[in-house]
Amino acid sequence: MDHHQESNPLKEIFSLSSSPFFSTLKIKKHIFVGISLLITFLIFSVIVVDLAGFEPHLCFGFLLSPRTLTKERGNDDVCDYSYGRWVRRRRDVDETSYYGEECRFLDPGFRCLNNGRKDSGFRQWRWQPHGCDLPRFNASDFLERSRNGRIVFVGDSIGRNQWESLLCMLSQAVSNKSEIYEVNGNPISKHKGFLSMRFPEQNLTVEYHRTPFLVVVGRPPENSPVDVKMTVRVDEFNWQSKKWVGSDVLVFNTGHWWNEDKTFIAGCYFQEGGKLNKTMGVMEGFEKSLKTWKSWVLERLDSERSHVFFRSFSPVHYRNGTWNLGGLCDADTEPETDMKKMEPDPIHNNYISQAIQEMRYEHSKVKFLNITYLTEFRKDAHPSRYREPGTPEDAPQDCSHWCLPGVPDTWNEILYAQLLAMNYRTK
């Protein structure tokens, strides 16, 4: 065969280009070239750019179904568990995995039925994410994955609420629950700033460290104005933090103390670089404290060992007044169904998610435990007026914390699901 007689593809293409049809297309040649360059750029970006940071739902959301979008939002998780709806538990579901108020790790203030609440319907709901299912909590598996490890909760009393919930959930897999003990012999109480429960069979400790601001709170600088009683040092991470190094799971939270009642009205202002700053606003201080938290995590924690979570803001449901001005939450017995009554996402969450987004390349095991939306529905599940025994009848209702068993159990189910997605297991 004469190779010189073979057809020349390029010659044929240019020959075709001289036809009337392609002559018309020449008019729009600049459009064709532009589109070609754009497609080439997109393909190059997908191939070359670090795929860990590529989020297809942002670029090509119009090509994805709602179900796909729900899964994509979770990045490396199988699902975005933070969006869904509350559905009633089926009566045929095995209840043996659920604990009751007899769990000895519960603070008296969270035992709502024991404190006089008549309805128990608030315990009959489960969270159903959109587009997927939340894995069933497996206490035995969680304990085994955490063998010889430490699970640490750091934050305010809402964090203690979640910590107590997890203790009760994990203890369901322990036949002799009396073996579980507090390492210092202390009773579980809101008056204790540090509590550590040991599961001896697994050599596991589950700890709670009370640090409402996460950063240092202390005396103001010398010669401060008389109205300054204390300061929040936004650039100094809490002194207890040295105890958290080496933890396998850390769950941080803060937010409920970041308001004017707990700061300015109480004579508490902000301090940075050793200097008092009375002009710094609460949310500016909050943002700066998160930067301090971020620096500590990146500098002090082992990115291979420590699985770090920052829980989002837990909504409050005071109606007809604030907590100290007659606010109530004892009238509701079912989750909210009117979306118009739902509060917008707190600005705290924007700062938290942004801080975590900035950390993703340096510490891939830092996650945003987003529970705000699902919790906003649950106006029915607070202790309200069913507080700990001995509380005066005219005391403010508790519309911040949660009855247990209750909503924090769902937070821990999501925590467990996210750990599974991360292939969590202590080393």
Swiss-Prot record:
Gene Ontology CC terms: membrane
Main location as per UniProt: membrane
Gene Ontology MF annotations: O-acetyltransferase activity
Domain of life: Eukaryota
Family in the record: Belongs to the PC-esterase family. TBL subfamily.
Residues passing through the membrane, by range: 31-51
Species per Swiss-Prot/TrEMBL record: Arabidopsis thaliana
Biological role stated in the UniProt entry: May act as a bridging protein that binds pectin and other cell wall polysaccharides. Probably involved in maintaining esterification of pectins. May be involved in the specific O-acetylation of cell wall polymers.
PANTHER family per record: PROTEIN TRICHOME BIREFRINGENCE-LIKE 8 (PTHR32285:SF210), PROTEIN TRICHOME BIREFRINGENCE-LIKE 9-RELATED (PTHR32285)
The entry's keywords: Membrane, Signal-anchor, Transmembrane, Transmembrane helix
Note: Contains 2 motifs that are conserved in esterases, but it is unlikely that this protein belongs to the catalytically active pectin esterases.
Membrane topology: Single-pass type II membrane protein
Name of the protein described by the UniProt record: Protein trichome birefringence-like 8
Compartments reported by the entry: Membrane
Chain positions of motif GDS motif: 155-157
Record motif DCXHWCLPGXXDXWN motif, residues: 398-412
